[in-house]
C-alpha cells in the first residue's frame, strides 16, 4: 500500500491479484520444470546454496525498494521463482535426509513450513508498522543468510543428501 501511495497509483485487489498471479506462475514453472533440471545439472547442495543467496538478495532488494511500486512488483514475482525452486529442492532434501516413512517426513516438513507461514504475518506486520516497510524483508534476508551459515556448519552431518 505504501509503495502504491508513494507512486500515486491506485493499487487495489485486482492489481494485487495480477502480481500474485505472476508470483504463482513463477513458482509453479520453477518448481515443476526448472528445479529438477538444476538439481540434476549441479546437485542438491549447490542449488540450495544458490537459491538461499538469490532469495536473500531478492528480499534485500525488497527491503531497499519497499517504497517503490515497480521494484516491489518485479521482486515479488522473482521471489516466486526462488520459492518454487527452493520448495522443490528442500522437499527433496527432507525426503532423502531421513529414514522415516515418506508420509511422516513430508507431513512433518509441511507442518514446519506452514507454521512459518502462520508466524510470518504476525511478526512482519508489527515490524513494518514500528520500524518501516522494508524491515520485514531485511529480517527475511538475514534469516536466509543465517540458514546458509547453519547449512555450512552442519554439512558434515548432511552426508546423506550430498
Regions found by a protein language model. Name each.
Residues 20, 24, 52, 106-114:
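Small-residue-rich transmembrane alpha-helices and their cytosolic helix-loop interfaces
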Residues 87-97, 110:
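Intracellular helix-loop hinge segments at the cytoplasmic ends of transmembrane helices
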Residues 100-129:
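A late C-terminal transmembrane helix in Major Facilitator Superfamily
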Residues 30-44, 128:
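Helix-to-loop junctions at the C-terminal end of transmembrane segments
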Residues 126-144:
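A membrane-interface helix-boundary motif in multi-pass transporters
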Residues 141-162:
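Multi-pass alpha-helical transporter architecture, strongest
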Residues 7-26, 104:
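Loop-to-transmembrane helix entry
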Residues 45-90:
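C-terminal transmembrane helical hairpin of 12-TM major facilitator-type secondary transporters
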Amino acid at each position: 500500500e505504501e509503495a502504491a501511495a508513494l507512486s500515486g497509483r491506485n493499487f487495489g485487489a485486482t492489481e494485487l491479484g495480477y502480481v500474485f498471479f505472476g508470483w504463482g506462475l513463477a513458482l509453479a514453472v520453477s518448481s515443476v520444470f526448472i528445479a529438477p533440471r538444476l538439481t540434476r545439472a549441479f546437485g542438491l547442495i549447490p542449488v540450495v546454496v544458490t537459491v538461499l543467496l538469490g532469495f536473500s538478495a531478492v528480499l534485500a532488494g525488497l527491503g531497499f525498494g519497499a517504497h517503490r511500486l515497480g521494484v516491489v512488483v518485479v521482486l515479488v514475482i522473482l521471489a516466486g521463482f526462488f520459492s518454487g525452486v527452493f520448495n522443490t529442492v528442500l522437499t527433496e532434501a527432507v525426503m532423502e535426509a531421513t529414514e522415516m516413512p515418506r508420509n511422516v517426513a513430508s507431513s512433518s516438513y509441511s507442518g514446519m513450513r506452514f507454521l512459518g507461514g502462520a508466524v510470518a504475518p504476525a511478526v512482519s506486520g508489527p515490524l513494518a508498522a514500528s520500524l518501516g516497510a522494508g524491515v520485514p524483508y531485511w529480517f527475511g534476508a538475514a534469516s536466509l543468510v543465517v540458514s546458509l551459515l547453519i547449512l555450512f556448519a552442519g554439512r558434515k552431518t548432511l552426508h546423506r543428501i550430498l
